[in-house]
Amino acid sequence: MTRVLDSLPSVSSDLQARIKAAPRNAVAHRALMAEVPAMSALQSGGQAALDALTDSVSVVAWNVERCLFPEDTASHIQPLAPQVVLLSEVDHGMARTGQRHTTEAMAKALEMAYVFGVEFHELDLGGPTEQAFCTDDFNLFGWHGNAILSAVPPERVTLIRLDDHGHWFSSDEVPADPDQPRLGGRMAIAAVLPTEAGPICVVSTHLESNADADHRHAQFDRLLRAIDAFAPDMPVLIGGDLNTGNHLPPDFDWQRETLFELARARGYDWSATPDGVTTRPSLITPHPDRQMKLDWFCTRGMRSTENRLVSSVDENGRPLSDHDAVWCRVALD
């Protein structure tokens, strides 16, 4: 059972030093993960406005690229009246986002409850374009992860880790990015939410970018199995950045991913996802290599009645993220 806390324990300076000095391999990574309580817990907070959702639910999934501007990001999706928001790449105690708890700030602005989980403990300030936003030369907590915002209080939540070998840490064994040293790995958060038609399970996830289709297939298989154990025979909505097409040269085509058929074979449907590519140039990623379709909804036991791709460019022409948001409305049959 995942522990749910009011705040996540920080990493001590002694442990931080040992993490930075440790061998860069999977064995060391797994041992260090076991010493960081926040890696196996979730943080909850905020204030839910409703007791139960209706049988028609408005959902946004958005990779907010660190969430440089939490209040503006919340304001940008407010016209959609979301009852569930599935976030990826949210910072908590990072210098590049003013040491803020960006999930908490968004939840407050939207008057929603939240659950936040750590994907990575960041060991540095980030890449060159991110360092331009740093307000300090240190990270207060160094947390970076996923979140679920909800207009209702979750009945149950769980953290689902999708790997433990240290894909961004174990540079002795895998091609880790030297500009982004990290402890942790890809993960998902699942929450059971009450609705007038009965409980549903919503899932915020983020699959691996620095890997091929087989790696993401294995992660998605692990995710679906974990959902079956957590919320058997329940309507499910999964949303997030699945990094489809990454490391699939020469065309980087999302249609070559095998996870789509994997999900269909288990009763899931992808039609809640709007058409179109979901990436764009941003303040942190001003010159992306290509445009890609990375962000998806995957549902079981519910029906999509509307969907839309929502530009991340705000009313002042500023991109809030290198991903556009995806929005859908689902009906519970």
PLM regions and their residue ranges:
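Active site of divalent-metal-dependent phosphoester/diester hydrolases
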Residues: 4, 113-148, 244-320
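Residues that flank catalytic or metal-binding motifs in active/ligand-binding sites
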Residues: 55, 102, 143-145, 185-189, ...
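Structured beta-strand-rich core segments of catalytic domains in phosphoester-bond hydrolases
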Residues: 4-11, 15-43, 91-197
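Short catalytic/ligand-binding loop motif for oxyanion handling, primarily in non-cytosolic enzymes
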Residues: 70, 93-96, 123-126, 157, ...
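Active-site beta-strand/loop signature of hydrolases that rely on acidic residues for catalysis
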Residues: 58-63, 73-99, 115-119, 149, ...
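Short, flexible loop segments at the rims of nucleotide/cofactor-binding pockets, characterized by
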Residues: 61-66, 92-93, 177-181, 212-215
